[in-house]
Amino acid sequence: MKLIVGLGNPGTEYEKTRHNIGFMAVDKICEKLNISLNEKKFNGIFYRNKDFILAKPLTYMNKSGDFVQALMQYYDISVEDLIVVYDDMDLLIGKAVIRQKGSSGGHNGIKDIIEKLKTENIKRLKVGIGRGDNAINFVLGKFSIADYQIIDKILDGVADALVSCIYNDVRFVMNKFNGSF
């Protein structure tokens, strides 16, 4: 069973902010597959079937690892079957990349997951949000209309790539999607 986790912050004040791109990706998958996150456990919400779990932590970003670790332990999911989607300030807006492993790159959500799981060997799909002058204000800020239109388009491909990860090896998905975002 695969586990896809979109990172973000809970609450309406954070909806459609740059830091919630992971939540937006999960929402896009739900829309494409006509499913909803109807289960609640371990301070998060998720959809589950025999092939995959699609999830959002309801903790704040820097506590995402607690939810991910609890879900993985409860459903006996190995780290090899986890993929995390989140924002990346080092990528230009409208760009995305799939990686098999890596450091946190300063992102507190993936940093907490790496610490809780005690490994950097976590598959991830990073979505570019660009960089602003003040990092905290920038990531917690909402997209401009022009940037939102770019993000809305890329989320389609991001959702397709994540769904492809459920049924295909990550190297196949990387070859197919990296460079096409």
From Swiss-Prot:
<comment type="function">
    <text>Hydrolyzes ribosome-free peptidyl-tRNAs (with 1 or more amino acids incorporated), which drop off the ribosome during protein synthesis, or as a result of ribosome stalling.</text>
</comment>
<dbReference type="GO" id="GO:0005737">
    <property type="term" value="C:cytoplasm"/>
</dbReference>
<feature type="binding site">
    <location>
        <position position="62"/>
    </location>
    <ligand>
        <name>tRNA</name>
    </ligand>
</feature>
<feature type="binding site">
    <location>
        <position position="108"/>
    </location>
    <ligand>
        <name>tRNA</name>
    </ligand>
</feature>
<dbReference type="GO" id="GO:0000049">
    <property type="term" value="F:tRNA binding"/>
</dbReference>
<dbReference type="GO" id="GO:0006515">
    <property type="term" value="P:protein quality control for misfolded or incompletely synthesized proteins"/>
</dbReference>
<keyword id="KW-0694">RNA-binding</keyword>
<keyword id="KW-0378">Hydrolase</keyword>
<dbReference type="InterPro" id="IPR036416">
    <property type="entry name" value="Pept_tRNA_hydro_sf"/>
</dbReference>
<dbReference type="GO" id="GO:0004045">
    <property type="term" value="F:peptidyl-tRNA hydrolase activity"/>
</dbReference>
<feature type="active site" description="Proton acceptor">
    <location>
        <position position="19"/>
    </location>
</feature>
<keyword id="KW-0963">Cytoplasm</keyword>
<comment type="function">
    <text>Catalyzes the release of premature peptidyl moieties from peptidyl-tRNA molecules trapped in stalled 50S ribosomal subunits, and thus maintains levels of free tRNAs and 50S ribosomes.</text>
</comment>
<comment type="subunit">
    <text>Monomer.</text>
</comment>
<dbReference type="GO" id="GO:0072344">
    <property type="term" value="P:rescue of stalled ribosome"/>
</dbReference>
<dbReference type="InterPro" id="IPR001328">
    <property type="entry name" value="Pept_tRNA_hydro"/>
</dbReference>
<feature type="site" description="Discriminates between blocked and unblocked aminoacyl-tRNA">
    <location>
        <position position="9"/>
    </location>
</feature>
<dbReference type="InterPro" id="IPR018171">
    <property type="entry name" value="Pept_tRNA_hydro_CS"/>
</dbReference>
<keyword id="KW-0820">tRNA-binding</keyword>
<feature type="binding site">
    <location>
        <position position="14"/>
    </location>
    <ligand>
        <name>tRNA</name>
    </ligand>
</feature>
<comment type="similarity">
    <text>Belongs to the PTH family.</text>
</comment>
<feature type="site" description="Stabilizes the basic form of H active site to accept a proton">
    <location>
        <position position="87"/>
    </location>
</feature>
<protein>
    <recommendedName>
        <fullName>Peptidyl-tRNA hydrolase</fullName>
        <ecNumber>3.1.1.29</ecNumber>
    </recommendedName>
</protein>
<dbReference type="Pfam" id="PF01195">
    <property type="entry name" value="Pept_tRNA_hydro"/>
</dbReference>
<feature type="binding site">
    <location>
        <position position="60"/>
    </location>
    <ligand>
        <name>tRNA</name>
    </ligand>
</feature>
